[in-house]
Amino acid sequence: MNKFIYETMYILRPDMTEEKVEQAITKYKSMLEEQGAYDIKIQHRGKLRLAYEINNQREGIYIQMNYQGPPTQIAILERAMRLSEEVIRYLTVKQELPKTPETDTQKNLEPAVALAE
């Protein structure tokens, strides 16, 4: 099974207090941990101006999470964000882990051994 690196960027309402923002970050981080995610890195980007108005908001609090884990965790996380009134936008992208040079070298050697026989 391939392992993937995921990045989820979500935008919280700008009128949330710092305490509520921290609660939201903790909630989504613990949700990922419960689903088997690991190597979770969170970056609090702060309050930034939106490119366009979303739900009558011109600013938002940007949070970025980078993590690894099973693909099933994404649907659960995004469903929770979709139902939450504190999240105004979210996006998750995935990237396949790069293959180690060791495995590429082994693949190249196998056909040569087969041809030599």
Swiss-Prot record:
Keywords: Ribonucleoprotein, Ribosomal protein, RNA-binding, rRNA-binding
Pfam families named in the record: Ribosomal_S6
Gene3D superfamilies for the chain: 3.30.70.60
Record-level Gene Ontology MF annotations: small ribosomal subunit rRNA binding; structural constituent of ribosome
InterPro entries per the UniProt record, alphabetical: Ribosomal_bS6, Ribosomal_bS6_sf, Ribosomal_S6_plastid/chlpt, Transl_elong_EF1B/ribsomal_bS6
GO BP field: translation
GO cellular component: cytoplasm; ribonucleoprotein complex; ribosome
CDD domains referenced in this protein's UniProt entry, alphabetically: bS6_chloro_cyano
SUPFAM superfamilies: Ribosomal protein S6
Protein function: Binds together with bS18 to 16S ribosomal RNA.
Family affiliation: Belongs to the bacterial ribosomal protein bS6 family.
Identification of the protein by name: Small ribosomal subunit protein bS6
Species name: Trichodesmium erythraeum (strain IMS101)
Gene: rpsF
